[in-house]
């Protein structure tokens, strides 16, 4: 309980109520394993995410600040859609869905571009969008998405494979400067195949009451330190 005495700053008082409202705005637990997690650096992390969909482990509540970051990303994604439409790009609808393994593995892409200005790209193509801070934005501009994030890289290849698309336009919004960066990525079907095999291993192991290997034998490893399932994994 926040102590609303005269020394409490107005920022803390107002944010207390905002954070409380966001915390109470509980989202329904996801009932499927999403494409955004299958490229995680640890296969056991993927398994725990799957187990959470079955109610076998508890997910940690989302921090209100993180919820605001998610909301910001959704706002910028919608604006990017509007900007592209203004520039003459045409959409084949939004939030196209795929599912596999009896709906255990599923996902929704941001959109599919079906036509647009003559700018050297071929349609149709998957469209995905991310809003990143300046550091992440510059890293993608410099080295490309593949080097920046395995999770994002695997996610778009899963979408392309299941939605039968051969390429993706990946748009990144710089949250600090509002710069835009676009990268065209061709489908590598092997990436999607390995992701599906990973999902299959996780499902099979869970049904057998087994745990897939961790990415490390050191619980102080940086990936473990930021994993919400670390306490369950190492107990």
Predicted features and spans:
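Metal-dependent nuclease catalytic cores that hydrolyze phosphodiester bonds in DNA/RNA
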Residues: 1-126, 133-135, 146
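Basic side chains
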Residues: 44, 130, 196-198
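A structural signal for short, well-ordered beta-strand segments and their strand-loop junctions
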Residues: 92-93, 126-128, 167-172
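Active-site-adjacent loop/helix micro-motif of nuclease/hydrolase catalytic cores
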Residues: 135-141
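Metal-dependent nuclease catalytic regions and adjoining charged, substrate-binding loops involved
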Residues: 5, 139, 146-153, 158-235
